[in-house]
Design a protein with these regions (language model features):
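A cross-kingdom feature that marks ATP-driven nucleic-acid transaction machinery
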Residues: 2, 25, 33-34, 41, ...
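Short glycine-rich substrate-engagement loop in P-loop NTPases that contacts/grips substrate
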Residues: 55-85
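Interdomain hinge/linker elements that couple catalytic modules in large macromolecular machines
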Residues: 2, 157-338
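Conserved Walker B catalytic segment
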Residues: 96-129
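Walker A (P-loop) phosphate-binding loop of P-loop NTPases
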Residues: 29
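Pre-Walker A adenine-sensing motif
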Residues: 2-17
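Short regulatory helix/loop adjacent to the ATP-binding pocket of P-loop NTPases
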Residues: 135-151, 167-168
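Structural recognition of the conserved hydrophobic beta-strand(s) that form the central parallel beta-sheet
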Residues: 91, 127-133, 154
């Protein structure tokens, strides 16, 4: 089954032969390799590129394990570049496997992979593409190391607009399946629910947890897994390392220090398993700092961690909306609006929350996620923070109800969930 990922394919095509290293990042199994080795490869072949001019090195494949040594990797690639008059395309998959633990842990130790990439950049007839599942040692470091000669494309799991047409279900069934099993592309190929659950559980234990534990040399694998479950149980809730540490300590089962929790959160974020949304003071126009919110990059992995037992559609919908906004390229923060209220005859400060402050260039939207709006009281509750925002940017409530887009007397736009998810320009209705 071929799933079209036209958004990302168009990005790759637009960056072809631009003299930069294309760094394709994203969580493991989100479709980076498929995009590069299938969709983009097929595009190049159809455009007249000869097969021998596409040099593919999947470093997570046992057949290529020797090329995790940067010296051997360099020698192998150079041996394939035999004609200076031909244009070559180099695909290096899961490049973090060519970075040693010592190189990661010790900033004074040069990362040899970067030397290999630098050498390839000097060749006029070579176009380089690198995929990886770690932001620190690929996107951030490469973009810094090559000073404007790196070009990142971040890949997410399937958006609902990609998942729904490929699922063969009506949109309501597809939505429930998407919330439950997530958007990793292979989930659509699993024949039944039992297979889907087994696949996700296997990914968590054999890939995500193991990868992070091994890559960061974590001694307490059980503690890392427990932390992932704590975050999974609290999506959409404000949290920080201290709160999570207190949760561990109060349970009496395990104690993990706050600095260790902070490191674990950083590792999970760098590996794209979770994403962090910071608090932003809308009136004060400044970031507040902790606590923040954490969302899972894929809901299926989140649900598998919790043995598919915590299915709170309100929180899952909020997480899915966050993921969709990130997929569309927005920067997403948690908004805070401070107001003054009367309490027992005295003025007091109160903070109201806006689920998402959404920015892209000069555009900004304020968005609330509301599972249902059954009555006017609920509408007023959801819009309470929005109507206190003293600017003219668009205020939106996204709800699971199925009805036309409309604007109420307070100037708040109400958008049905499917209208939002299935139309790229839905925020501008």
């Amino acid at each position: 089954m071929e799933i079209k990922r036209d958004k990302y394919l168009k990005k790759l095509i637009s960056k072809r032969n631009n003299g930069l290293i294309k760094v394709i990042t994203g969580i493991r199994r989100c479709g980076k390799s498929y995009l590069l080795f299938n969709l983009y490869y097929d595009y190049l072949i159809k455009d007249g590129v000869a097969e021998e001019c596409i040099i593919s090195v999947p470093l997570d494949d046992d057949d290529y394990i020797e090329y995790c040594d940067p010296q051997k990797l360099s020698e192998y690639i150079k041996s394939k570049i035999t004609d200076s008059n031909k244009q070559y395309y180099v695909f290096i998959d899961e490049a973090q496997y060519a970075i040693t633990k010592e190189e990661m842990k010790n900033p004074d130790v040069p990362i040899r992979l970067y030397g290999v990439l630098n050498g390839l950049l000097r060749k006029k007839n070579v176009d380089v593409y690198v995929t990886g599942s770690n932001s620190k040692f690929l996107s951030s470091d490469i973009l810094t190391e090559f000073r404007g000669r790196g070009d990142e494309i971040h890949i997410a799991p399937l958006a609902f607009s990609e998942y729904y047409p490929a699922s063969g279900k009506d949109k309501y069934e597809a939505w429930q399946a998407y919330l439950f099993y997530g958007g990793l592309p292979h989930i659509l190929a699993e024949p039944d629910n039992e297979s889907k659950e087994a696949y996700l559980e296997r990914l968590n234990s054999e890939i995500y947890i193991r990868d992070i534990v091994e890559r960061y040399d974590i001694r307490d694998a059980a503690g890392m897994e427990t932390l992932m479950k704590v975050i999974a149980s609290a999506i959409g809730s404000l949290s920080n390392a201290q709160k999570i540490s207190d949760t561990f300590n109060s349970s009496g089962d395990k104690s993990i220090s706050m600095p260790t929790i902070s490191n674990y959160l950083k590792y999970l974020t760098e590996s794209f398993v979770i994403q962090k949304s910071e608090r932003y003071d809308i009136k004060g126009r400044k970031y507040i700092g902790t606590p923040s919110k954490y969302y899972y990059t894929d809901l299926g992995l989140r649900n598998a961690l919790l043995n598919f037992r915590q299915f709170e559609e309100t929180h899952l919908m909020e997480n899915a909306i966050y993921n969709e906004l990130i997929y569309r390229g927005y920067k997403v923060d948690v908004g805070v609006v401070e107001i003054r209220v009367d309490e027992n005859g005295k003025k007091a400060r109160k903070q109201l929350e806006v689920d998402f402050v959404v920015n892209q260039g000069s555009k900004r939207y304020y968005i609330q996620s509301a599972y249902a709006l059954p009555n006017q009281e609920k509408v007023e509750q959801e819009q309470a923070s929005l109507i206190k925002i003293p600017d003219s940017f668009k205020k939106i409530i996204i709800t699971s109800g199925n009805f036309p887009v409309w604007r109420n007397d307070q100037g708040i736009t109400i958008i049905g969930l499917f209208d939002f998810l299935l139309n790229d320009d839905s925020l501008d209705y």
